[in-house]
Amino acid sequence: MLSLNLSESLRIPFQNPRPPKSDFSSTSSSPSSSSRRCVSAYPIPIGFSVRNQYFSRCLTQLRRNESQQLGFRCFQRNDAACYLEKAESEEHDRNLDVLVESSIAHSRREIQRVLMFLAVSGSVALLGTDPAFAASSIPNVTQSLVTSFGDLGDISSGFASAFLLIFFSELGDKTFFIAALLAARNSAATVFVGTFGALGIMTIISVVLGRTFHYVDEVLPFRFGGTDLPIDDIAAVCLLVYFGVSTLLDAVSDEGKADEEQKEAELAVSELSGNGAGIVAAANTIISTFALVFVAEWGDKSFFSTIALAAASSPLGVIAGALAGHGAATLLAVLGGSLLGNFLSEKAIAYVGGVLFLVFAAVTVAEIVT
């Protein structure tokens, strides 16, 4: 009987105690459903030691559940960060696509205008050409092309005009900013080689086109009232006047043209990665720079201005002057293109370039008249 009363007295009625605070209490404002099930769903043994083991298991389960919830929230945050990063990358790609499409469309419009002008000029020249004279002159085309560099003209004047025109056309141009930005991220020597190589090839192509137009005019001259008119010189004057007026209008109207050119150059350069060392990295930088500058320069103002100068001036003088102008502008870009803007205004450079276009057009007109 005494043992029965002792055993009955040891049966203390159980009251669910408050679980101790855990390290994960700050991550949740209320106990989770799994922790409530862990505390109240199962009958609690009477013995204190057994009860302590039970609470230890509950706390272990509680920590496990809270860890899973915390990890899930971290996973959600990582997903959100990845989503934002992906969205920013897609937005950058869309901006780059729009930039490339607009640049291609602008170059295409310029090329279409010039080709339309050349087509009209060629049609007028053919209409004013004597058929018998044209037929007799066609066999001399090969001989004219072979001796194409025999008529060199005044090399000094061609050099001076090409140097001044190209130098002031390239300062502040997109090609200038591309060279400056690439030189800030890569070796200045490799960037100069790639940029100058692309501009040199472009200059040779422009001079060949200009001289071809010049010798076609010699084979099929334009006759007006018994007088032969130099249609190549007239076309050169029209091109120079067109680019001179357009440059001056851009200088007057476009306040943020330099910023726009710089942003386009930054987007173009952001797609190139020339990091590394050694011969392979230098070759990759040269090839990437060459391709980027060649595409950016094709159909540009300096491209057609070189064609116009080559059609009316000495080809060797134009090549030497254009290469010297491109080399000087590229050297300034790779050595300190960002510092140049502190001393020269983009609008002032545009005014000088536009005036030079008009001056050379006037000089060509004077040569035609005399």
Swiss-Prot record:
GO cellular component: chloroplast membrane; chloroplast thylakoid; chloroplast thylakoid membrane
Disruption phenotype: Defects in photosynthesis and reduced growth rate. Pale yellow leaves with reduced PSII activity. Altered Ca(2+) and Mn(2+) partitioning in chloroplasts and reduced Mn(2+) binding to PSII.
Lumenal, thylakoid side: 135-161, 210-228, 297-315, 370
Keywords: Chloroplast, Membrane, Plastid, Thylakoid, Transit peptide, Transmembrane, Transmembrane helix
Disordered, as annotated region: 1-38
GO molecular function: calcium ion transmembrane transporter activity; magnesium ion transmembrane transporter activity; manganese ion transmembrane transporter activity
Membrane topology according to the record: Multi-pass membrane protein
InterPro entries (alphabetical): GDT1-like (IPR001727), GDT1-like_CS (IPR049555)
First-listed, main subcellular location of the protein, grouped into a coarse class: plastid
Family: Belongs to the GDT1 family.
Quaternary structure and partners: Homodimer.
Name the record gives this protein: Protein PAM71, chloroplastic
Source species of the chain: Arabidopsis thaliana (Mouse-ear cress)
Native organism taxonomy: Eukaryota, Viridiplantae, Streptophyta, Embryophyta, Tracheophyta
